[in-house]
């Protein structure tokens, strides 16, 4: 088993044990595990839809066209009740990341940055040298609200306080809240470190301009909503799906297809254009 999988499963196992061990007497260990699991799954799923499917593929790459009410709703819900991610600064960093790809100007990571440096950069990224997030939606009330630094602090204090109120125990709430954010940091490291180091994963396209790799195991693909298929994505960043063969497991694309069935999203003209060198007969979308 690869090291990144060991770390991911270890965090999840430690989270489960901590939920049972620190559960207060009036809840008990098994109910504590159930509460912790519910918090984990809900925050992960909403966060994945928000960041990977909507902000990443919908706004940053304009490959998918979501209903605007859905974009604004999930943005407010995730950033109020889940792990906060500023949509404006994230889109700006991500576009710069694709423009410079592991070279000076990439705010996420340079090719020379190791594990610990990249871990630090997940929390304190390099300064952005340009503003590439000028989309009209960033001027909407919801995006201006959640992008406010005061909101970033207040929302996290609020959702921690709400969790504390619901479970009735400060220690138990702290364990759930903090440990899940460690898991979220691991997800970020999958995307920023392990998929940008040629010692890990596999490369379908030998693009020398960056170090992007595909990591295709079940846990990373599920946890990141397929954002760990970075070599595919960097080769065709405007394509609406991240898997480039039917045999590649693509959890993120499955959720997008489900949202399409619900009438929440459609392909953009650029997102639906299948490059000739991508080994897919069709997008199946």
Give the positions of each predicted feature:
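Non-catalytic, topology-defining segments of multipass membrane proteins
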Residues: 1-190, 194-195, 239-285
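Glycine/small-residue-rich hydrophobic helix-like segments
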Residues: 192-246
């Amino acid at each position: 088993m690869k090291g990144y999988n060991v770390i991911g499963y270890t965090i999840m196992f430690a989270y489960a044990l901590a939920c049972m061990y620190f559960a207060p007497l009036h809840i008990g260990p098994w109910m504590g595990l159930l509460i912790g699991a519910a918090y984990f799954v809900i925050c992960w799923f909403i966060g994945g839809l928000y960041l990977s499917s909507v902000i990443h593929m919908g706004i940053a790459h304009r490959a998918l066209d979501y209903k605007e009410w859905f974009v604004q709703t999930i943005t407010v819900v995730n950033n109020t009740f889940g792990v906060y991610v500023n949509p404006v600064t994230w889109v700006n960093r991500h576009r710069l990341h694709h423009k410079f790809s592991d070279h000076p100007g990439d705010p996420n990571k340079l090719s020379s940055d190791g594990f610990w440096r990249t871990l630090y950069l997940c929390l304190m990224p390099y300064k952005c040298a340009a503003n590439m997030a000028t989309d009209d939606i960033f001027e909407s009330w919801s995006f201006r609200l959640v992008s406010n630094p005061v909101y970033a602090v207040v929302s996290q204090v609020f959702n921690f306080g709400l969790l504390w109120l619901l479970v009735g125990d400060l220690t138990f709430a702290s364990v759930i809240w903090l440990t899940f954010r460690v898991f979220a940091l691991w997800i970020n490291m999958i995307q920023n470190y392990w998929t940008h180091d040629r010692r890990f994963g596999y490369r379908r396209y030998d693009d020398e301009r960056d170090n992007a790799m595909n990591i295709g195991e079940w846990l990373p693909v599920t946890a990141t909503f397929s954002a760990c298929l970075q070599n595919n994505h960097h080769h065709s960043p405007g394509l609406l799906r991240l898997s480039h063969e039917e045999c590649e497991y693509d959890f993120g694309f499955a959720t997008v297809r489900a949202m399409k069935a619900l009438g929440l999203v459609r392909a953009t003209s650029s997102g639906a254009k299948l490059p000739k060198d991508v080994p897919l007969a069709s997008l199946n979308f």
